[in-house]
Amino acid sequence: MAKRRKTSREKKEDTNWQERVIQIRRVSKVVKGGKKLSFRAIVVVGNETGQVGVGVGKAGDVIGAVRKGVADGKKQLIEVPLTKSNSITHITNGVSGGAKVVVRPAAPGTGVIAGGAVRTVLELAGVKNILAKQLGSNNPLNNARAAINALETLRTFSEVAEERGVSVEHLYT
């Protein structure tokens, strides 16, 4: 069986991804002989140019769990439309479980004002100026997924103009 070699282009695509571990938790499964321990890792993967994903991995060791989390995160990537000032186009909110996240665009120079898992998701998405607030649950996985949900609902100016049947220039006049 012949092995397929990675081309230089595929290697370049792999090198610009960044990953950050949000949480590592030791979990247990009760089996006949007692408790079987394993690790769960929540990982955010992004390239800081508008692509980001959240993954969860479970394995018997921490490194294996993180590796699986990165692979899962790359499977669940979303595209984030960024403005010229590296912010988002409009206010939006996202929900996942009991967690609700509200994100608002901010002026250049504001920075990322957000906490916990939401901050990590926004930074790896490439957003530089944004305000975000977590409401409800403080569960890191649900907050990260709520942030992804909020970023998924973003629309660009051209998409809104196309929906309304007008040109982008006439959108706000």
UniProtKB/Swiss-Prot annotation:
InterPro entries: Ribosomal_Su5_D2-typ_SF, Ribosomal_uS5, Ribosomal_uS5_bac-type, Ribosomal_uS5_C, Ribosomal_uS5_N, Ribosomal_uS5_N_CS, Ribsml_uS5_D2-typ_fold_subgr. GO terms for cellular component: ribosome; small ribosomal subunit. PROSITE patterns: RIBOSOMAL_S5, S5_DSRBD. One of its GO terms (molecular function) is rRNA binding. Keywords: Ribonucleoprotein, Ribosomal protein, RNA-binding, rRNA-binding. Residues 17-80 form the S5 DRBM domain. GO terms for biological process: translation. SUPFAM superfamilies: dsRNA-binding domain-like, Ribosomal protein S5 domain 2-like. It comes from the Bacteria. With S4 and S12 plays an important role in translational accuracy. Located at the back of the 30S subunit body where it stabilizes the conformation of the head with respect to the body. Part of the 30S ribosomal subunit. Contacts proteins S4 and S8. PANTHER family: MITOCHONDRIAL RIBOSOMAL PROTEIN S5. The N-terminal domain interacts with the head of the 30S subunit; the C-terminal domain interacts with the body and contacts protein S4. The interaction surface between S4 and S5 is involved in control of translational fidelity. Belongs to the universal ribosomal protein uS5 family. This is Small ribosomal subunit protein uS5. It comes from Synechocystis sp. (strain ATCC 27184 / PCC 6803 / Kazusa). The lineage of its organism: Bacteria, Bacillati, Cyanobacteriota, Cyanophyceae, Synechococcales. The gene is rpsE.
